Swiss-Prot record:
The keyword Secreted does not apply. Substrate binds at residues 44, 68, 90, 147. Catalyzes the specific phosphorylation of the 3-hydroxyl group of shikimic acid using ATP as a cosubstrate. The gene is aroK. GO terms for cellular component: cytosol. Monomer. The keyword Cytoplasm applies. This is Shikimate kinase. PANTHER family: SHIKIMATE KINASE (PTHR21087), SHIKIMATE KINASE 1, CHLOROPLASTIC (PTHR21087:SF16).
Length: 179
């Protein structure tokens, strides 16, 4: 697999990665940004940096509504950027305002994976506040189903199940080159 930088079409201002937790947004985003010669921006990392505490701590201290408000502020900020690959948090697309801003900001790519794959990928992770009390496949499936209508709003959808990060990046760059 070639690792050289490719040129994104000039019509591609940003690439926005959406998807449920554990679908590969961060891993794919970092490599995709490198391949495109874009900057990489992780919304959750921006929030943590701005607040000075972890996502878990934000949820524990202030609750999900406060976190979602911070997330919308971060979306507003990155939507003004150019030549950036943005990895959103899994729930960022729940907000109609966020979906609108993200669509205007660039090409929205939704990464998916099977429930089983997400469970496998998240098995050892402890920084997922919405799964802290229930990490079951049933809980994950229910959350994925609740969000499906919002994820489906993407320009491109890629199932990452069983694929390497490189393969997913190649699918995205192939799409962008043909756009």
């Amino acid at each position: 697999m070639a690792t050289s930088t490719i040129s994104a079409p000039s019509s591609v201002r940003n690439v926005i990665l959406t998807g449920f937790m554990g679908t590969g947004k961060s891993s794919v985003g970092r490599l995709l940004a490198h391949r495109l010669g874009f900057r990489y921006c992780d919304l959750d990392a921006l929030i943590v940096e701005g607040e000075g505490v972890s996502i878990n701590e934000i949820f524990a201290r202030h609750g999900e509504p406060h976190f979602r408000a911070l997330e919308t502020e971060a979306v507003r900020s990155v939507s003004r950027e150019e030549r950036c690959v943005v990895s959103t948090g899994g729930g960022a697309v729940i907000s109609p305002e966020n979906r609108c801003l993200l669509r205007k900001a660039g090409v929205v790519v939704n990464l998916t994976a099977t429930v089983e794959e997400v469970c496998r990928r998240l098995r050892e992770e402890t920084d997922r506040p919405l799964l802290k009390d229930d990490r079951s496949g049933e809980r994950i499936a229910a959350m994925m189903a609740e969000r499906e209508q919002f994820y489906a709003d993407a320009e491109l959808r890629i199932d990452t199940t069983g694929k390497s990060v490189e393969d997913v990046v190649a699918e995205i760059t192939g799409y962008l080159e043909g756009r």
